[in-house]
Amino acid sequence: MKTLIRPLVVIFVVLTAVTGLAYPAVMTVFGQAVFPSQANGSLIEKDGRAVGSALIGQPFDAPKYFWGRLSATSPMPYNASGSGGSNLGPLNPSLAEQVKARIAALRDAGTDMSTPVPVDLVTASASGLDPEITPAAAAYQVERVAKARNLSADAVAQLVAANTAGRQFGVLGEPRVNVLKLNLALDAAQAAH
């Protein structure tokens, strides 16, 4: 029996040391050396204070701000510990009701309804935490935001363009706008205005 237990204990201790101590330590040092911003959560700072992460969406509901994708984490929106989609299928009547309610909320906020609503403004993402919207979703909100801030639509559209990231390496993903970064740029532009 002793001959069976000793190798098991040795393997347990060695694997615990490798996977529980050595590997995490090496990856932490590597991450801090090569990707310090990402390793620390891709935090966005304003006046030396962290105001959010570039990787996790935040709720914005005031008309003077661009709104991001809806969060599927309830009851607390954009709760990273509750990440997950709504799991409503495309034929589910509840999804259609939710989309209609979201379109009505956009209309009530004074958004121009003469053009089709971009899908990312009325549906949640798979994670429920998306920090980004499509350029079309940002363009759809330009008039409302400009009116609420007493800025020209052209000035707001220029901020959208300046905060639009292209495809990674020119081929991966789609162009996107980080809502938090755009809203911070809007605040800065209005303060300077």
Curated annotation (Swiss-Prot):
Function of the molecule: Part of the high-affinity ATP-driven potassium transport (or Kdp) system, which catalyzes the hydrolysis of ATP coupled with the electrogenic transport of potassium into the cytoplasm. This subunit acts as a catalytic chaperone that increases the ATP-binding affinity of the ATP-hydrolyzing subunit KdpB by the formation of a transient KdpB/KdpC/ATP ternary complex.
Q: Where are the transmembrane segments?
A: 7-27
Q: Which GO terms describe its cellular component?
A: plasma membrane
Q: What does the record give under GO molecular function?
A: ATP binding; P-type potassium transmembrane transporter activity
Tell me its family. Belongs to the KdpC family.
Compartments, as annotated in UniProt: Cell inner membrane
* Record bears the keyword ATP-binding: yes
Instruction: Report how it sits in the membrane.
Output: Single-pass membrane protein
Q: Any idea which UniProt keywords this protein has? A: ATP-binding, Cell inner membrane, Cell membrane, Ion transport, Membrane, Nucleotide-binding, Potassium, Potassium transport, Transmembrane, Transmembrane helix, Transport
Subunit text: The system is composed of three essential subunits: KdpA, KdpB and KdpC.
The cross-references to NCBIfam families, in alphabetical order and at most eight, read: kdpC (TIGR00681), PRK00315.1 (NF001454)
Kindly provide the name given to this protein in its UniProt entry.
Potassium-transporting ATPase KdpC subunit
List, alphabetically, the Pfam families matched. Answer: KdpC
